């Protein structure tokens, strides 16, 4: 093509180029384009050639053409500028000598005064005059020579005689910097505090066994240990320090038996902890109050005395000043067991303190309990009950272990009667209608040994589901007219949400 056959003025002027651009033209890094190429770019622009065509014809990058044309349209100049580059050096040797001369004549002369004098005497013009910061830098680096103190303490800076600056205060001489390299880095050496000869001699004696600055670290530790041992510590403290020094920095997580002291092992052994546990148990049993039932959040176990009566006892619970309803589970309140319970009670020696015991219930109550007695530690809902549907989950609202149920009803004033007496339930006390539990048949008979017979049902409907807890009252559920013949206790014990 004819583009490549044309002579390139830039190539002719700069045979030793630094690189080739994308258009095939050569250039030199860090150098502006020659004036010939700049003039040619301006001429082609006056002829109406587009910048992209100028870039192709002259093999100059499009950015360079645009920059040159933009500066030409703004300033009318095609000379390269200093935009983004370094300024020309204004601190020429002539200017530096003049600044030094002004400073010798008047050492208290300011930099701006030197700048004004350079302009007034015509040494520099507005374009070449150095700035105030440049003048200060010239004075600091070239006029003021570095300060070299002499051994006698009178500092004399090296420089041209007659115009050197003497500092106001002479620096103190550094003493014994070469004789005592270790002491110069100590606190006394840094602060310049002289040490006594006895201290130096003791340090030399302690360090004479191979603990120099280039010695082994283990020997330095031994020398430090000897130094501390001779001055401050007793024999017991030294033994404790030796044990600490020999201990590894990062001990294992699982310590072995030899790392534990004998007194600690005896202190935290199981026989030593057993009396403490007994005291805690006794204090817990003695500190029971009426608020225990409301604070119980899950199944808990209480100690049970082994001595018990084999005969069935009828015990009437009489709380002092509180009702059993706030701290009794819903299953007890709904089944009529909150007031009077027939159970096999375990008696303690001191009857004045509140006691908690497990009980065994033998009377079937309206399908709530089966013919089997409750076993301590077993859930009520885990037993097979005759009238419950098979799809009810084993855990429900009334799922409490027997020990928890026994502990929720504190036996404060327990009166034991060996004679058989008729039992009254909540329904009998609060309503004049016949009791569904058959607790009083005719003239004060006992509980009926036969289970309550009722037709089994397999499905629930919305009529049996109650979400309002205000409906859980004894007269409502144990009334024959309000619920009919179906057992409401079974439905409410497992369907209350």
Swiss-Prot record:
InterPro entries: Homeodomain-like_sf, PAIRED_DNA-bd_dom, Paired_dom, Pax2_C, PAX_fam, WH-like_DNA-bd_sf
Species of provenance: Xenopus laevis (African clawed frog)
Protein name as annotated: Paired box protein Pax-2-A
Family matches, as Pfam families: PAX, Pax2_C
Tissue specificity annotation: Expression becomes spatially localized at mid-gastrula stages and is confined to the nervous system (midbrain, hindbrain, spinal cord), sensory organs (optic vesicle and stalk, otic vesicle), visceral arches, developing excretory system (pronephros, pronephric duct, rectal diverticulum, proctodaeum) and thyroid gland. Splicing does not appear to be tissue-specific and tissues displayed the same spectrum of splice variants.
Keywords from the UniProt entry: Developmental protein, DNA-binding, Nucleus, Paired box, Segmentation polarity protein, Transcription, Transcription regulation
Chain intervals with Low complexity compositional bias: 166-178
Induction: By activin. Weakly by bFGF.
């Amino acid at each position: 093509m004819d583009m490549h056959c044309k002579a390139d003025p830039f190539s002719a002027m700069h045979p030793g180029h630094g690189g080739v651009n994308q258009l095939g033209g050569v250039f030199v890094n860090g150098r502006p384009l020659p004036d010939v190429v700049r003039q040619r770019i301006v001429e082609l622009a006056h002829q109406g050639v587009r910048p992209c065509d100028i870039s192709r014809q002259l093999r100059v990058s499009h950015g360079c053409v645009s920059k040159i044309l933009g500066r030409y349209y703004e300033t009318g100049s095609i000379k390269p500028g200093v935009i983004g580059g370094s300024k020309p050096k204004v601190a020429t040797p002539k200017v530096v000598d003049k600044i030094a001369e002004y400073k010798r004549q008047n050492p208290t002369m300011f930099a701006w005064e030197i700048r004004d004098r350079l302009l007034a005497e015509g040494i520099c013009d507005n374009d070449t005059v150095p700035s105030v910061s440049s003048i200060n830098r010239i004075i600091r680096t070239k006029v003021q020579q570095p300060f070299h103190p002499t051994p006698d303490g009178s500092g004399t800076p090296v420089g041209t005689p007659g115009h050197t600056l003497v500092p106001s205060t002479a620096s103190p001489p550094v003493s014994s910097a070469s004789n005592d390299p270790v002491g110069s880095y100590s606190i006394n050496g840094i602060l310049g505090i002289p040490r006594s000869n006895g201290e130096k001699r003791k340090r030399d004696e302690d360090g004479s066994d191979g603990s120099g600055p280039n010695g082994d670290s283990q020997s330095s530790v031994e020398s430090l240990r000897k130094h501390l041992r001779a001055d401050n510590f007793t024999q017991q403290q030294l033994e404790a320090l030796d044990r600490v020094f020999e201990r590894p920095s990062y001990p294992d997580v699982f310590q072995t038996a030899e790392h534990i002291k004998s007194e600690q092992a005896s202190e935290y052994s199981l026989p030593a902890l057993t009396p403490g546990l007994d005291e805690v148990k006794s204090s817990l049993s003695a500190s029971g109050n009426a608020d225990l039932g409301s604070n119980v959040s899950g199944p808990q176990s209480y100690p049970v005395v082994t001595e018990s009566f084999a005969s069935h006892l009828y015990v009437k619970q009489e709380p002092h000043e509180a009702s059993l309803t706030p701290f009794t589970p819903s299953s007890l309140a709904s089944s009529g067991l909150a007031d009077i319970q027939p159970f096999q009670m375990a008696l303690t020696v001191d009857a004045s303190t509140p006691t908690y015991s497990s009980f065994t219930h033998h009377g079937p109550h309206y399908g709530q309990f089966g013919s089997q007695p409750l076993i301590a530690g077993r859930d009520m809902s885990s037993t097979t009950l005759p009238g419950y549907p098979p799809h009810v989950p084993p855990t429900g609202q009334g799922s409490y272990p027997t020990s928890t149920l026994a502990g929720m009803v504190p036996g404060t004033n327990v009166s034991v009667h060996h004679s058989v007496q008729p039992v009254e339930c909540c329904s009998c006390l609060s309503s004049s209608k016949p009791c569904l539990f058959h607790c009083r048949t005719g003239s004060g008979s006992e509980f009926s040994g036969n289970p309550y017979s009722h037709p089994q049902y397999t499905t629930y409907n919305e009529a049996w589901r109650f979400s309002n807890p205000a409906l859980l009252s004894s007269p409502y559920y144990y009334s024959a007219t309000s619920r009919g013949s179906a057992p409401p206790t079974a439905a409410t014990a497992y369907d209350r949400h």
